[in-house]
Swiss-Prot record:
Domain of life, source organism: Eukaryota
Cellular component GO terms held in the UniProt record: cytosolic large ribosomal subunit
Species per Swiss-Prot/TrEMBL record: Cyanophora paradoxa
Signal peptide: none
Residue runs in coiled coils: none
InterPro entries, per database record: Ribosomal_uL13, Ribosomal_uL13_CS, Ribosomal_uL13_euk/arc, Ribosomal_uL13_sf
Sorted UniProt keywords: Ribonucleoprotein, Ribosomal protein
NCBIfam families the UniProt entry points to: L13_A_E
Any Pfam family the entry gives: Ribosomal_L13
GO BP: negative regulation of translation; translation
CDD domains: Ribosomal_L13
Family recorded in the similarity comment: Belongs to the universal ribosomal protein uL13 family.
Protein known as: Large ribosomal subunit protein uL13
Record GO terms (molecular function): mRNA binding; structural constituent of ribosome
Amino acid sequence: MFEKVVVVDCRGHLLGRLAATLAKELLNGQRVVAVRTEEINISGSLFRNKLKFHAFLKKRMNTNPRRGPFHFRSPARILWRTIRGMIPHKTPRGAAALERLKAFEGVPPPYDKMKRMVIPQALRVLRLKPGRKFCVLGRLATEVGWRHSDLVTRLEEKRKTKSAAFYARKKTLVNLRAKAAVAVASKTANIQKELDHYGF
């Protein structure tokens, strides 16, 4: 997929598989925007993933913990860090690839009007065996210190309401256009035949 910018809707994708696909695309020169990162899924129960995250939180520099490693709590940064681990980010090529990535919780304004994609090979419903446990990244992030879950939920509700209203208007206009085309079909039959002849 090579386009100017690809917007990926992360809802229902498995974290590792999504990150691997995006890392490959970034290294190939594709610009990627990941939205709705709080809806990413991780295989394994919430309890198990919390234990793993708390083990990760213990990893720090003895003499000065402020020097790293840094433990990001927001879903967008967790995805960013996962992708960073799959890219040679200390080389100029890897650093340039990481610059091509943007990740957001929710769907912020410029991207709410753009076509969003999914990645089939990373979708949980296609990859995880039914009945297996999984958890949502937003919930995990909230339980380890992310404080903006409520705000993102509120903004997403507003966006979905506006989107539903826009879709209803669009559907009405499409129906009106279809009716108008049927109404004038008999009058424009000769013209349409001529246009068909020329491939329009």
